Amino acid sequence: MAVYDLEEQEKIEALRSWWKENSKFVLLTLAACLIAIAAVNGWRWYQRTQAAEAAEIFKTISSLSGKENLSKIQETSQRLRADYAATAYAARAALISAEESFKAGDLARARSELQWVVDESREPGLVDIARLRLAGVALDEKKPEEALQLLNAPHDAAFDGLYLELKGDVLVAQGKLNEARDAYNEALKKTEGAYRAIIEAKRDAVGE
């Protein structure tokens, strides 16, 4: 029994000695873990709060349209891009603002909104839409080479028909009618439904 007590005492002393040497490291490690957990939870709370606030602001822009509301739309988009860029609403607001700006003839603002989506959005589908519309802006600005460069960029296959159709439009603007016809024919292969009639009309207008 005495041997057992001695062995236990030695273990206790060894543990005390180890704790004396390593307690600071253990406590610091524990503190770091607790800080990390708190940071993760805090970040998640921050993201949820940001998303909720952005959603409320987005309601404003999604309910507006028309030239009379253009400044409000642009201001709201700017606010979302500046303060809530990491949320899903910023890119969507930018697309709305770009569309309304384009309709109003403000091509510079439309371009800046669309370029922001291309550069900053983490959603490939939105980037593809923005790049397509940016090519349309470039065409209106009489910059066909830039438009073609945008349309030749990698994109989801779901957008092939729209990209090829606009490519045909750009080639028509350049006077390259044979290439335009080929682009329209390729677009028809990628398009279903009633919209085919529009592409067919463009192709037929080019002639044989």
What are these regions (language model features)?
Residues 95-96:
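Early exported N-terminus immediately downstream of N-terminal targeting peptides
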Residues 37-56:
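Transmembrane signal-anchor/signal-peptide helices with a preference for the extracytoplasmic
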Residues 1-32:
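N-terminal positive-inside, membrane-proximal cytosolic segments immediately preceding the first
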Residues 56-92:
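Short extracytoplasmic
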Residues 26-29, 50, 68, 101, ...:
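Short Lys/Arg-rich amphipathic alpha-helical segments
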Residues 84, 89, 99-208:
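Soluble extracytoplasmic domains of inner/organellar membrane proteins
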